[in-house]
Amino acid sequence: MSKAVTTALAFSCDRHTPPTNFAAAAAAAAQSGVVDELLIWDQMTNFWPRQLWHPDNTPMAAIVPDLDSYSDAFAMSGYLAASAPGIGLTISTDAIRRGPAELTQTMMTLANMTEGRAKVMIGAGEAKQITPYGWRRSEGLARLEDQLKGFNALWASTEPVDLPGNHWTFKQAWLGQSRTHRPHIWALGGGPKLFYLATTYADGISAIVPCVAPTPESWAHTVSTMKAELERKGRDPEQFEFGIWFMSLVHEDADLLERALDNPLMRWMAGVFGRLDQSAWDAEGIEPPLPRDWHYAVKLLPVTWTESEIQGLLRRTTHEMAQKSFVYGTPESVAAQVEQYVEAGATWVSVCDILPLLLDPVDAQAGLARNIEICARLKKAGKT
């Protein structure tokens, strides 16, 4: 590697867990010296149907009543910034549920709290976060354009701003003169329109592996294509960031990992999320478990799934598909797999380890140390 990659520790903050527990974990990450940022997800509900969260599938279900009681990501980010000074904050959100002026104001505030180490990744949105609450997922990309253009306009001017938009229009919009620290704004996701918006207006882009880039070579192709587009637009591609979330299972016990791949919770994730475009399974000679035009971001509403629909998907999702849907192994093995994507152009990485959902509480708590070890290995590799 030519330089050390930026590392982010994924935090899924729920309301069942005392906030002080997250503060302690954030402090441990900050003190490690190898974790640059926390990644906090702005979610309304999780990926799994409620029927799958029970003690037959995981001992954690006897302790945590549900997986959907998320904390507000922005409120928790402020709390964690105060609890662990020196750590950076990255929030992933969608373009629909907050206005561009409000989001810009919030991110300016977090940038001040972290001395410039604040980032927001904005996607076109997931139906599960949007449709049940009265928003329209179909407006996602148009609203993303408004978000990116609105942020840039508000940051660039200390005078009132007029800006036409698709859904939000500024008329003498003003957030004052303070410009202490600029937050970073990235696009989150994929597709031609989102790539166009990212290379035109954003500071970077992030995607999830292996779900959209199952090999380092496929990721390298994405990076090279986007860098060429940045150059065509007169932007410096070396100033643009490329981030990856790794959907991961991390543990020292290989047998435990193989059993985890057959657990209904992980098999479900492989079915709905293992390849975001279901048709992508065709290239690997695998029959998709859902219709080829089915995409989780547009179609997945976990609360509405019936028991028969759930069991049907689990039957159609094979062990091989689960193996191809996660980056999994020991901390050393996962770090080595992540390094390949860094060599292929990733500049920011977060190992999103969801295995603790299946573990007993003591083993689940050890997940923090495993993921910090991965960050340490990545930092060490960046110095060689």
Task: Describe each region flagged by the PLM.
Residues 3, 99-239, 292-295:
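Internal, glycine-rich beta/alpha segment that forms the wall or movable "lid"
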Residues 5-11, 36-40, 89-93, 118-122, ...:
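Hydrophobic faces of well-ordered beta-strands that scaffold small-molecule active sites
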Residues 37-70, 126, 131, 209-216, ...:
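Glycine-rich, proline-tolerant flexible connector loops at the mouths of alpha/beta enzymes
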Residues 57-89, 228-229, 365-384:
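Alpha-helix-loop-beta-strand connector modules within alpha/beta enzyme cores
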Residues 139-175, 216-343:
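An alpha-helical appendage that flanks or caps ligand/catalytic pockets
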